[in-house]
Structures are given as C-alpha cells and as structure tokens.
Amino acid sequence: MQNVFIIGSKGIPASYGGYETFVDKLTEYHQTNDKIKYHVACAVDDNKEVGEFIYHNAQCFKIKRKKIGPAQAIVYDIDALKYTVNYIKKNNIDKAIVYILACRIGPFFKRYVKQIHSLGGKVYVNPDGHEWKRAKWSAPVKMYWKLSERLMVKHSDLLICDSKNI
C-alpha cells in the first residue's frame, strides 16, 4: 500500500479554497482504493484538541495553528511535517510520499527532506504559482517567498504543477 501524506492545505472536509477542495475530492475519489492510504494534515485553532479522525477513508491528523500573525502558515506546515516524519518513523512506513502544497517552508525544507529520504520516502511539491509576485506582500516578504520557492523546488523529488504558467 502506498502511503501519501498531504501537508499545506487547511484540511478536510473542505471549507476554504482550492487546495482544500483538491484534497477533499482526491480523498473522496480514492476512498475505496486499497492501494493508497492518504494522511492529511488539518489545521485546528490553538484552543482546540489535537488528535486524529477518518474522512473519506483518509487518516486526518489535527495540527494546532498558532496565532502568530502571517507566519502561522509557515509554522503550521513545519509542525505538520514534524508530525509526519515522526509518524513515518513510529509506524515503520516504507516508501512514503510526502506531498506538500505551496512553498512556504523553503529555508527549513532541506532538513526534513533528508529525514524523509533516510526513512525511504520521497517529497513532492506543488508550488502554487509565484507567491512572491503578489502585490499584497512587502518587499522583505516577497524576498522570503522567492527564496522559499527556490529552495523547495531545488530540494523536492518531484514538482506537480496544476498550471502551465508555473
């Protein structure tokens, strides 16, 4: 059985946007496929309980989203990645695929890729366009996004793009 860990969406069931709808539909369409087991990181507020639940036959694990402003998505992705690495180790999962949606954690990424590789896994990334080009970000934030994207593209095993423009 192929274990696929999905990090970077707010979670399922979908109630936010594109990535969440993608993950919701992916797990729905494959819920009876006994050759794939999905594990999905789901964000919960800091005051909520963590734990696991099953949705569309996917194992969903709750990761607390810290209230630290704009950086909360970065910390959430790192916390989900830590959880995933520990879960793979604890359960002796061989050849896991860790699929990361968006390029938020580039400066921290290589360390986790090495850990996943040492456990026999692969890391796939969906870059989600060029976040660093968006007008809403200040110059320092744009620099971070550009660096982050470059590092994640460099260290991933496979890029999965859903747009020709990417």
PLM segments and residue spans:
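An aromatic- and histidine-rich active-site surface loop
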Residues: 74-85, 95-128
